[in-house]
Amino acid sequence: MGAVKIFNRSKGLNTKDDPARIDDNELSIAVNVDVSPEGRISRRKGYSSIFDSGCHSLFSAGDYMLAVVSGKLSMVEKDGTISVVTDVVDSHTIRYQMVGPVVYGISPSIKFIIKDKIFYPWVVGENNGVTTDRQFYAPPYGQLIAHHSSRLYIADGSVAYFSEPFRYDLFELFPGHIPFGRRLSLMAPVADGMWYADNRDAYFISGMDPAKDIVMRKFSGAGAAEGTGILIPGEKVGSGRMAGSNVVAWCGKSICIGGPGGYFKNISGEKLELPNANTGSGYYHDGRLTFCLHSY
């Protein structure tokens, strides 16, 4: 009697159905394994430790990395050399946005600029334009930062503030903001608008100028855990129909993708039940999305 093949390829995780009822090619649990696009299961590759001090708020700035190491904002070179940038940092997570060669950093307690590897406070600039009675302020503290259509956006609680075009040191806080109902956990740009989310729902706001009338679409139940948003080249998603623009992926109760024009898709399907999470992180490399979720 010839061999009978009972397992050809894995469909991945199924955490919603009873393990006794899932298909033969589904997994009820997976620890440190990869499932290839062809359904092959392999052990996940290991990693090398660069330093063993407690760290958080990691950000790649090209030829160096920023991170809070032992409570201090530090610069980590490619060879693992660590130098302290500033020690005026507490336990809050820092979010970063790179515009050209300049890194802008924000948290609920610190805001700064790093240019040519030098730390500067992020303060209000001078308005050198036409005479105006408008009142400009320094950027607010906040939990999220993003860049879109020549403006920097900062989320402080449930409000998204935006800078003047090409003047990232000038914020007209009123009326220069977009209010939401709950604390924002995602803020990410695509070609023709911005994606936002709180812990329950997601929103797409179309248009390039937030100072003008905006159109908002709501996607109920598509909330994000703060920190999980990732920008991905559009040609890497699906059939490549969104080539030329970024799309954003995030993770909450489901794994979602948002693209230009309000394109939305839940890619975790009906068989993956994720735990409740307040915060997390996301990573995209070599065609793979990786999310880490944290509940507290």
Feature map (PLM): residue ranges:
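Repeated scaffold domains used in trafficking and secretory/extracellular systems
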Residues: 51-59, 88-101, 129-149, 181-189, ...
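Beta-sheet-dominated scaffold domains
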Residues: 5-10, 182-296
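Beta-propeller fold detector
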Residues: 83-87, 121-126, 172-175, 213-220, ...
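Hydrophobic beta-strand segments that make up the repeating blades of beta-propeller
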Residues: 65, 103-105, 194, 247
